[in-house]
Amino acid sequence: MANRIDLCDAADVAPGNALKVEAGDLTLAVFNVEGEFYVTDDACTHGPGSLSEGYIECDVVECNFHNGQFNIKTGAVVSPPCMIPVKTYKTVVENGRVLIETE
């Protein structure tokens, strides 16, 4: 059965922006892509960069450390030097709150 973790108010993340959120032992990036919300691990898989502090264009985030890029929706690597996809989470918005579902 999935557990839900409440992350933030949807109004805290403007379209085209991200917010770093700590929930328990997770450090996450909450993205608003044209009104749709997506959540990934905040840490880049290549180095110490924070994806919530990266440059966002459409559904791609560029890490602020080595400029590797990830698809925000799928976690897939878009450009090197990153080689490992970033973890994504099933995301829901309920009563104006952004939540993730975990196993």
Give the location of each predicted region:
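Short cysteine clusters
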Residues: 44, 63-66
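Short cysteine/histidine-rich metal-coordination sites, predominantly Zn2+-binding motifs
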Residues: 58-64, 77-86
